[in-house]
Amino acid sequence: DAPCSGEGMNYKHDKNTNYRDPKLAQGFSNLQYQILRSGVLATKVWGEIVYSTCTLNPLENEQVIWKILKEFEGAVELSNVEIDEKSPGLMQYWDENLLSQEDAQKVARFWPHKQKTGGFFIAKLKKLSSLPYTTQYDKRKKEKIWLNDSFELQSQVWNYLLENRG
């Protein structure tokens, strides 16, 4: 259950459903993507990950799944969420394509007015193959870093440290 804007719960608790903060939703979307990405990297081959939110916002749901499927194409796939009376995911949001028709049928979306519950979203991913894991450290190791080993620079650093750090 990823941190989310909680927009789906507003309907359940009769809160103001007209207020939506796009910046907040985009911030959550970025965080959710990073969390799910870390989960994909940490999951063993043939392992499954269940992703869920209590929001109706496609930026926090289908878009996150779309980005993961795109980044890890061929190594991760959607599995069918087998829940009765679920609604399919969204294939498009405004002018942005999200999920294919096949993938939209695999995820579960729950609408307050249809399922008489708070709004939420569920997707199930399966990892099909191992992935290369790179860190910022790995990227830096590949780049040549030229060090200035001149006595003058060393002397300047030493003097600065003595004066400012004791």
Which residues does each PLM region occupy?
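S-adenosylmethionine
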Residues: 1-166
